């Protein structure tokens, strides 16, 4: 992959849990590529959503020690977008102009703000293009 790309929360849920083995391999490869290439990006929101799921829905729930390891080894190298006035403004515009939910618009705005060309997610419409950003579902 030559361009920067953004990973949505569900990629990490599949990569770091045992819940859906069929998606774990694909998600794990994307996370590995993101870290190894230095071209993968996540936002504060992805980290927050991931840990919310990991602590409440993983079976068994992720332990604090596992969370510390995931934060240091997986998320720290990728975390590049934090909340800002401009991020919220762009997300509001995306919600208004594209009928995207608020939380999804924050993800899209974060990907755009970090100049990503691809947003990997299964929650948005595969193939949709928003400016220079293309949505891609890696599980299709």
List each model region and its residues.
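Glycine/small-residue-rich phosphate/adenosyl-binding loop
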Residues: 47, 59-75, 82
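Short, well-structured N-terminal submotif of metal-dependent ribonuclease cores
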Residues: 1-42, 57-65, 69
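Acidic, PIN/NYN-like endoribonuclease modules and their adjacent C-terminal/linker elements
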Residues: 2, 108-140
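Histidine- and aromatic-rich ligand-binding microenvironments
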Residues: 7-8, 43, 100-101, 123, ...
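Short, conserved alpha-helical segments within structured domains
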Residues: 43-47, 67, 87, 107
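Active-site neighborhoods of divalent-metal-dependent phosphate/nucleic-acid chemistry enzymes
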Residues: 76-122
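Alpha-helix C-capping/helix-to-loop hinge sites
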Residues: 15, 33-37, 53-57, 74-78, ...
């Amino acid at each position: 992959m030559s361009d920067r790309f953004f990973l949505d929360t569900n990629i990490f849920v599949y990569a770091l849990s045992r819940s859906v083995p069929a998606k774990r391999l694909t998600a794990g490869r994307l996370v590995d590529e993101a870290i190894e290439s230095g071209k993968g990006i996540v936002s504060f929101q992805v980290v927050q959503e991931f840990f919310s799921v990991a602590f409440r829905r993983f079976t068994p729930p992720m332990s604090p020690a596992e969370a510390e390891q995931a934060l240091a080894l997986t998320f720290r190298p990728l975390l590049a977008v934090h909340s800002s006035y401009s991020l919220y403004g762009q997300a509001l515009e995306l919600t208004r102009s594209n009928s995207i939910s608020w939380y999804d618009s924050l993800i899209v705005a974060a990907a755009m703000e970090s100049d990503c060309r691809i947003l990997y997610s299964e929650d948005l419409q595969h193939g949709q293009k928003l400016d220079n950003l293309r949505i891609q579902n890696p599980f299709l």
